């Protein structure tokens, strides 16, 4: 699958995870509704599904990975920033096939696209500190 299809999968995952975080609906229902309502022809749907289920299943673990590097409480994070960080941390912790720098750069781009004005700087700061602890030898 092309890198652009993976990028689109991440973009869709941010949107679906945002919905899941706010609604607390079952992730399978969120996935079904998202795929039924959105144009996903240029999306790596398998990767989208993996990101959704992986982040939802591991959300407490992923939150634990980010907490030491946050400048504020986890509960004070914006939902977009939380979704972006969870995706990046999932890729760093569970997807060795995703290069270290790709996971970070994609997260920064997602934060620029979907987050508040300076959220990409916040995401970059957290990941710059967390990533070496997650993948110490894989820069």
Swiss-Prot record:
It comes from Enterobacter sp. (strain 638). GO terms for molecular function: RNA binding. One of its GO terms (cellular component) is cytosol. The gene is nusB. Belongs to the NusB family. It holds the Pfam family NusB. InterPro entries: NusB-like_sf, NusB_fam, NusB_RsmB_TIM44. Keywords: RNA-binding, Transcription, Transcription antitermination, Transcription regulation. PANTHER family: ANTITERMINATION NUSB DOMAIN-CONTAINING PROTEIN, N UTILIZATION SUBSTANCE PROTEIN B-RELATED. This is Transcription antitermination protein NusB. HAMAP family: NusB. It comes from the Bacteria. Involved in transcription antitermination. Required for transcription of ribosomal RNA (rRNA) genes. Binds specifically to the boxA antiterminator sequence of the ribosomal RNA (rrn) operons. GO terms for biological process: DNA-templated transcription termination; transcription antitermination.
